[in-house]
């Protein structure tokens, strides 16, 4: 964890199982490829030479997500947010400016790398919200409400845990595993 992303509990549990195992050699093909990919990404960011700093894109992304992919959302708003996130990502790679160099600590470069990650993550968040055709948890899809205005779940379709996989072509695929309830039965919350 680096303070920018929060990891689910499954990741530290997985890593704990690796304690005492032999670390990957810095000369391993995977390690060399990761270093090459990171260097290429940094060089691409430094070469843009645009007019807006990373914080400008970060703020704009927050505005897009707040308006289109917030707690209360609609299909129309999500579709608009998806289009805006994709356009902002293109603008980022065409107009970001990163002051300073890449040979020493550069917080502006760190921010630019994080904003690039956030732009990718934002697209998946919006795709996931579009794909999930129900109201559940803390998220309310306006199209999926009872006549009384309460959230309408769809447990037959969405009683699963899901993760998104990005393919080599940049497309996203949702992977799911069904949930089972053995100790506490699944039930609809009612706050009335």
Q: What is the role of each PLM region?
A:
Residues 1-192:
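Glycine- and aromatic-enriched mobile tails/lids
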